[in-house]
Amino acid sequence: MKEKLREPIGELVTGRDPDEVTVKLKKLIEEINPPIVVAVGDYVSSKLHEHNVNVDIYIVDGKIERIEKSIDLICIKNVYEAVNEAGTISPSAAEKLHELIHSPEMWPAVLKIDGEEDLLGLAAILSAPDDTIVVYGQPKRGAVLVRVNEDVREKMIKILQEG
């Protein structure tokens, strides 16, 4: 499964540096005008926040490429916690994420993960309504913008089933 997930699920956004990537992401998100934007990962979340991109749900674990890092999302008052072990999607984390996605009164929100958040992008794609944007980092390459629809969900289910 990890090999399949190393390839971008959506549109790979690249640039000379992280700021250029973030500016491109911001433009794409504004053009699409999605009902929900979910950012997965500390670095992507911090860059989108720094560039004032309207993100509804940030999913973070306090680490960037497995190294403890503190990011500044202090202005987000709605912070929720869940446990998710590395390489898994725990039922409790998936349920909390599902609740956040379907509760706009809780936005903007940070879902702080004790463990690892990487695979929760899959849970976001499976839970989110059509046209939701899920953004996650693609280390050393840029960021990936996924526009959720039934085809993307089916692809994720197939990857999970094949394990």
Each PLM stretch: what is its role?
Residues 38-46, 114-121, 140-141:
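Gly/Ser/Thr-rich loops at beta-strand to alpha-helix junctions
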Residues 79-119:
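Internal catalytic-core helix/loop-beta-alpha segment
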